[in-house]
Structure formats: structure tokens, C-alpha cells
Curated annotation (Swiss-Prot):
Its EC number is 4.3.2.10, 3.5.1.2. This is Imidazole glycerol phosphate synthase subunit HisH. The keyword ATP-binding does not apply. It is found in: Cytoplasm. The keyword tRNA-binding does not apply. One of its GO terms (biological process) is L-histidine biosynthetic process. The gene is hisH. The lineage of its organism: Bacteria, Bacillati, Bacillota, Bacilli, Lactobacillales. The active site is at residues 79, 181, 183. It comes from Lacticaseibacillus casei (strain BL23). Gene3D superfamilies: 3.40.50.880. It holds the Pfam family GATase. Residues 1-206 form the Glutamine amidotransferase type-1 domain. Keywords: Amino-acid biosynthesis, Cytoplasm, Glutamine amidotransferase, Histidine biosynthesis, Hydrolase, Lyase. GO terms for cellular component: cytoplasm.
């Protein structure tokens, strides 16, 4: 069963609806025992990094998510949930993240003249081969964000162009993230969630 971390971030229900539509066994939960027993974990998120980390800390979920990642089972962060996977964010001051992928979250530059937040459909360009990211290769997905992750090339699977390349898919072993919302990205987003479900059933895929 896939567990969606329930910590009042806004888009948990949309992720659940998408998994329900696919017929994927899933559950919303903040219970550490249920989270640790999951075959895969999804960390969604909408809003500010600082408030999201505060909510996770209040529920004592930070060490639980870190422990789940250490099991080697697939973990997927979505939008703000992807940003939380990194070491820190500079949104409204500096805030420590989960530290599961090296890197920082910084503001999208405004000197390109493009509107911030980056909102709407944009294409993903793969930067290295990966079975999960391949689903989204040269495909448009739905973005809503004002900050983006900066990380090492080996952890960047895809970027999207918005005045400059912005990180759109990341991976470190079994820990993955999408800056876009697969649950709001139509058929291609559903295909990505289906691929994540397949990863929870095949240990080799979770290490790809």
C-alpha cells in the first residue's frame, strides 16, 4: 500500500483521488507505524517551506520520513514536497529541510522578465536516463512554484525552461521528487504515478 503523508498541506486529497482513479491501494496517514509499513510513500505539499517543515515537526514526522527513506523503499515528493527533500530553503529566511538529497531551495530569478510564480504547463527535458523520469521526457506537466531546487547534476533527472533551466525531477537512489504536480498533469501525470506504483512492487526499479 502507498501512504500519502497527511500533514494539512492542501493537495493530499488530489493525490489520493489520482491514485484512487488508477486503482492503487493507498491511504492518507500521519501514523508512524502505518508510514513505515507502506510499500511506497508520497510527500505532497502546497504553500511555504517553513510552514510545511513546522507542520512535519509538530507531528514528529521528520525522523519518520527519514527512517522510511533509509529502508530503500520508494519515496516521492511532489511540488513543495520535493523541495522538502533538500537540505534547506531560503524562503522567508533559512529553514532546514529533510536532508535526503543534497541541495538548497532558492527563489526563481525575476530578471528574465517572466512572471513569478512559474504557473502553468511546461515541458520536461531529461538530463540523464531514468525509468521514472522517462515517462515525462519531452512532456508538458503542470507547475505552480516561486522557488526551485538547486542540486548536483547527478541528482537532477530533468529540467524545465523558464528563463533558465529549473530543476523539475530529482532522484537520489529510492528518493524521488517532481517540482510539477503529476496529479494535475492529466494522462502523463497519471502515467508517472503508475510508474511510481510499479516501483513499489519491484525493488530493482526503486534502485534504478
Amino acid at each position: 500500500m502507498i501512504v500519502i503523508v497527511d500533514y494539512d498541506t492542501g493537495n493530499t486529497r488530489n493525490v489520493k483521488k489520482a491514485l484512487d482513479y488508477l486503482g492503487v491501494n493507498n491511504q492518507l496517514s500521519a501514523d508512524p507505524a502505518i508510514i513505515m509499513a507502506a510499500s511506497g510513500l508520497i510527500l505532497p505539499g502546497v504553500g511555504a517551506f517553513k510552514e510545511a517543515m513546522k507542520a512535519l515537526n509538530q507531528r514528529q514526522l521528520v525522523p519518520v520520513i527519514q527512517a522510511f527513506a533509509a529502508t530503500g523503499k520508494p519515496l516521492l515528493g511532489i511540488c513543495l514536497g520535493m523541495q522538502l527533500l533538500f537540505d534547506r530553503s531560503f524562503e522567508f529566511g533559512e529553514t532546514a529541510g529533510l536532508g535526503l538529497i543534497p541541495g538548497e531551495v532558492v527563489a526563481i530569478p525575476t530578471d528574465s522578465g517572466l512572471a513569478v510564480p512559474h504557473m502553468g504547463w511546461n515541458t520536461n527535458s531529461l538530463t540523464q536516463p531514468d525509468l521514472f523520469a522517462a515517462v515525462f521526457a519531452d512532456q508538458a506537466t503542470y507547475f505552480v512554484h516561486s522557488f526551485y531546487a538547486t542540486t548536483l547534476p547527478q541528482f537532477t533527472l530533468a529540467t524545465t525552461d523558464y528563463g533558465q533551466p529549473l530543476t523539475s525531477i530529482v532522484r537520489r537512489n529510492n528518493v524521488l521528487g517532481t517540482q510539477f504536480h503529476p496529479e494535475k498533469s492529466g494522462a502523463i501525470g497519471l502515467a508517472g504515478l503508475k510508474k511510481f506504483k510499479e516501483m513499489t512492487e519491484d525493488e530493482a526499479l526503486s534502485r534504478d
